Amino acid sequence: MKHIVIIGGGFAGVSTAHRFLKNVGKSTTAPYKVTLVSRDSHFFWNIAAPRGIIPGQIPEEKLFQPIAEGFSQYGPDKFEFVLGTATDLDVGGKTLVVDVDGKATRISYDYLIIGSGSRTKIPGPFKSDGSTDGVKQTIHDFQERVKAAKTIVVVGAGPTGVETAGELAFEYGTSKKIILISGGPTVLENRPASVTKTALKQLETLNVDVRVNTKAKDPVTLPDGKKELTLSGGEKLVVDLYIPTFGVLPNSSFVPSQYLDSNGFVQVDQYFQVKGAEGVFAIGDVSDSEAPQFWFVEKQSVHIAKNLILSLSGKAPTPYKASATGMMGLQIGKNSGTGHFGNFKLPGFLVKTIRKTLFVENLPKTVDGSML
């Protein structure tokens, strides 16, 4: 029996497991079992986190769904869920070491898919940083702090920062001071100029105070609990709530260093196989294949699931063609948004309509595989 072990309870891991389990029986009668290893008991719909930190906007059950229940249709002979954290990988011995309730558990594999995702450089509400209980508590803490704050600064003007500032300003633009700090000359750097211009205008319409070409040093906590930031121009900015949205780090600490690039991302070839590691693959945010964006992860998941089935059927896998086309869509408050496909700017009404709910209705269908 072939044992496929998948690491990660996010989009990459859960989607790949479902796609394989739903389709493998159509192509081969070879015996198999899938084990999904996740440090989170629940799938976190972090796409909606910028709105989720605002009190009363999104109920907890629309942000979190239990993973194991979503795979109940396959039966214990075909699927097993392991709640634990990958701590070590023995490529030669085809063994993964997982910390399960403080105990080192060794799991042998024939194929290993690393879809462990990434985390923010500074822990916050946008990524899980260790457990479902932990990120739930972080969300609740931020909701309380947002409610109490009079002045909020969002540092980092990439998609997460822009969406977060937009959501906050839509709700509180006339009652709280919302500041967005960008280290570059505009927001959404490296996006088409028409998109950055539109985003900036929409933010300003919502009364966001956008500071460009501005760096912020790590904040100092004052005796009253407020945060003091020193900006690159020397200005001291005192705020009630500091929300960092810049930078992600791959969750690859368990992977031997020879398989990582200088930034810690897992190096893969055109088949998503980890370079130099037979039978080991990596997709999504943890790999060096494409930008860490949802639609790229979806494409990668489809491809790796098909290749796994081909391998079990004794057929050669097919190479993946990475996309050279940049794309983005983001909500800026509930009534505006912008985005692009390549150099083509998407109409704001289209982005707003598509992303109106931040896709929370797709959470249950993602976890149980019914939308794949």
Swiss-Prot record:
<keyword id="KW-0285">Flavoprotein</keyword>
<protein>
    <recommendedName>
        <fullName>Oxidoreductase ptaL</fullName>
        <ecNumber>1.-.-.-</ecNumber>
    </recommendedName>
</protein>
<dbReference type="Pfam" id="PF07992">
    <property type="entry name" value="Pyr_redox_2"/>
</dbReference>
<dbReference type="GO" id="GO:0050660">
    <property type="term" value="F:flavin adenine dinucleotide binding"/>
</dbReference>
<comment type="similarity">
    <text>Belongs to the FAD-dependent oxidoreductase family.</text>
</comment>
<dbReference type="InterPro" id="IPR036188">
    <property type="entry name" value="FAD/NAD-bd_sf"/>
</dbReference>
<comment type="function">
    <text>Oxidoreductase; part of the gene cluster that mediates the biosynthesis of pestheic acid, a diphenyl ether which is a biosynthetic precursor of the unique chloropupukeananes. The biosynthesis initiates from condensation of acetate and malonate units catalyzed by the non-reducing PKS ptaA. As the ptaA protein is TE/CLC domain-deficient, hydrolysis and Claisen cyclization of the polyketide could be catalyzed by ptaB containing a beta-lactamase domain.</text>
</comment>
<comment type="pathway">
    <text>Secondary metabolite biosynthesis.</text>
</comment>
<keyword id="KW-0274">FAD</keyword>
<keyword id="KW-0560">Oxidoreductase</keyword>
<feature type="binding site">
    <location>
        <position position="285"/>
    </location>
    <ligand>
        <name>6-hydroxy-FAD</name>
    </ligand>
</feature>
<feature type="binding site">
    <location>
        <position position="51"/>
    </location>
    <ligand>
        <name>6-hydroxy-FAD</name>
    </ligand>
</feature>
<keyword id="KW-0732">Signal</keyword>
<dbReference type="InterPro" id="IPR023753">
    <property type="entry name" value="FAD/NAD-binding_dom"/>
</dbReference>
<keyword id="KW-0325">Glycoprotein</keyword>
<feature type="glycosylation site" description="N-linked (GlcNAc...) asparagine">
    <location>
        <position position="251"/>
    </location>
</feature>
<feature type="signal peptide">
    <location>
        <begin position="1"/>
        <end position="16"/>
    </location>
</feature>
<dbReference type="GO" id="GO:0005737">
    <property type="term" value="C:cytoplasm"/>
</dbReference>
<feature type="binding site">
    <location>
        <begin position="8"/>
        <end position="12"/>
    </location>
    <ligand>
        <name>6-hydroxy-FAD</name>
    </ligand>
</feature>
<dbReference type="GO" id="GO:0004174">
    <property type="term" value="F:electron-transferring-flavoprotein dehydrogenase activity"/>
</dbReference>
